[in-house]
């Protein structure tokens, strides 16, 4: 999913609500884990910067929650 589509489909309030639900129910870390796994196994291709950001975000979720 492209980030631009999120802004086109959902209001800022809806985006925040959805993000809070994902975080509160710990789905966010599962989604991050799955995305990173797909990248590492070659199922998905992303640039190095995006990969590093995903790993950093994953680590923050693991250690801060």
Curated annotation (Swiss-Prot):
Disulfide bonds: none annotated. Pfam families: AbbA_antirepres (PF14156). It comes from the Bacteria. This is Uncharacterized protein YkzF. It comes from Bacillus subtilis (strain 168). The gene is ykzF.
């Amino acid at each position: 999913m492209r980030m631009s589509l999120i802004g086109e489909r959902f209001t800022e309030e809806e985006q925040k609500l959805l993000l809070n639900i994902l975080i509160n129910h710990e789905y966010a870390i599962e989604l991050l884990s799955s995305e990173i796994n797909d990248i590492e196994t070659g199922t998905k291709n992303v640039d190095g910067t995006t990969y590093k950001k995903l790993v950093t975000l994953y680590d923050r979720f693991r250690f801060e929650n």
